[in-house]
């Protein structure tokens, strides 16, 4: 019986693909070597310990229907579209070795006519007249008895969109995370015109089989043809939840300030695991009571635009004379945290 397993995803859903990856990694026999090939439609994928409000322009993502997905490995934020080919290599220890999986990807690129090399811990680069250009980035995860290496190959990605979603608004945001580094990148199609996702997948599969000296049939998976994995539904529910994608953010503080015709407002939020733990409100309004009441109501709430909007509008019954001001405040506040 082969120790290899090959999975190809027909789904562009990042939550589905990451849930498949997580399930297989947790449940695979320690003797198995797995290759999983996939790609995501418009998605910002963040590292396990990152703060989406710091790393991403969450407002623009919502406007453009770009999903947020938190992966289980560390590292920085990346933008995925269908111009990215994603790969995951998994193996039990002591066989797991990220230099092996890196060598497989380099061999695949070489078979297509692209000479690349590893650079630093995470990247693959090609040398051009204008300097080294990054064509692949990776992240890793290890447990006591297994590990995985996953990454992307830039095939024909819309590189102009990287800045759209990975450059946050210039908010007064103080966070305990580390800002991702945006390096110089290149698409493989610039080096090999006409190359496709299928070409890359076939090359990686062949390099995978060649390295291990055996072949297996591919398992093609999708939401309509899910792999036989215990607890997959629960894993998918977690992967697609707000609590995982946003709520796992490191603790941070956020300052909002604005001047309205009825007075200036300054709000200080302390946020942990996606929930507001402390709110301070300052205003020169002649009637500060609604803002003081709002500050008290928000403690314990999820740091979500719709939740802040609901809490603010709920005060109208207590302060009917300030209804117009509260509606103006709620619209501004919700827009500021998106």
Curated annotation (Swiss-Prot):
Miscellaneous notes: In the transfer reaction, the free carboxyl group of lipoic acid is attached via an amide linkage to the epsilon-amino group of a specific lysine residue of lipoyl domains of lipoate-dependent enzymes.
Chemical reaction(s) catalysed: L-lysyl-[lipoyl-carrier protein] + (R)-lipoate + ATP = N(6)-[(R)-lipoyl]-L-lysyl-[lipoyl-carrier protein] + AMP + diphosphate + H(+)
Residues where (R)-lipoate binds: 134
Name assigned to this protein: Lipoate-protein ligase A
Record's function text: Catalyzes both the ATP-dependent activation of exogenously supplied lipoate to lipoyl-AMP and the transfer of the activated lipoyl onto the lipoyl domains of lipoate-dependent enzymes.
Family label: Belongs to the LplA family.
Enzyme Commission number, as recorded: 6.3.1.20
Pathway: Protein modification; protein lipoylation via exogenous pathway; protein N(6)-(lipoyl)lysine from lipoate: step 1/2; Protein modification; protein lipoylation via exogenous pathway; protein N(6)-(lipoyl)lysine from lipoate: step 2/2
Subcellular location: Cytoplasm
Subunit structure: Monomer.
Gene: lplA
GO MF terms, alphabetically ordered: ATP binding; lipoate-protein ligase activity; lipoyltransferase activity
Organism: Klebsiella pneumoniae (strain 342)
